[in-house]
Amino acid sequence: MKWMNGSRKIAAQWLFLFTIFLTVGLAIPPVVPAFANDQQEATQLVEKARLTLDSFMSDNNMGAFRDLLKKADGVLISPELLKGAFIIGASGGNAVFLVRDKKTGQWSCPAFYTIGGASIGLQIGGQASEVILLVMSDRGVTSLLGNSVKLGGNVGVAAGPVGIGAAASTANLSADILSFSRSKGLYGGVSLDGSVVAVRSRLNDAYYGRQVSPTDILVRRDAKNAQALALIEDLSKSAAKKSTAMGELLPMAMSQDPSCG
């Protein structure tokens, strides 16, 4: 009888341990699926950003954008910035940010960000816009290397000139960042003054397969993902500077560092 009692105790202990294991296991979030979802989201965002850039480059209303892009130190692309508005407007969307090396003209791999903000005013309807921010100064680039930055507060932002015949010379060249948007909704123009641009660390980590910071990606350039090459190549061609004498593309602006591959 003693051996039966001992067996029962052992069985009870195993059942207890199994219950604890099952409970703890269910409490742990599904890290792998979440990581996979982040990776997929990041990959899709990079491709959508490429399509947004291409659409801006082919838009007759974006002549000033094309000219100013050649002078930009960085480019932040949000393929879809959603904004719902009625008295109080709230906006939000994901974006990728790439930085140009001033010495070589080569563009970095993309770092992932989110744009969010709220505004108060008499507004009607909702809006979905493609938005590209041209970062025109070192201060603008540096501000985006932190965890978050408030546009119009920590760094100056102004709307870029849009429309057929709009000249780059009419842009507010004192602004650190110039914003350009193509609206799909009921009211045009996106005011980003007061919006917050913040790093999406999870997307950065998932896309590059390890923990990385914006500085790792944009400055040190030691993060790689070949999927970004199509975006970088399109940006390199679009932002290539022309020599004033011959009107030819500068070689340094066209030769892209293969380190992202």
Predicted regions and their residues:
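N-terminal secretory signal peptides that target proteins for export/translocation
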Residues: 1-12
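Small-residue-enriched, tightly packed secondary-structure blocks
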Residues: 35-261
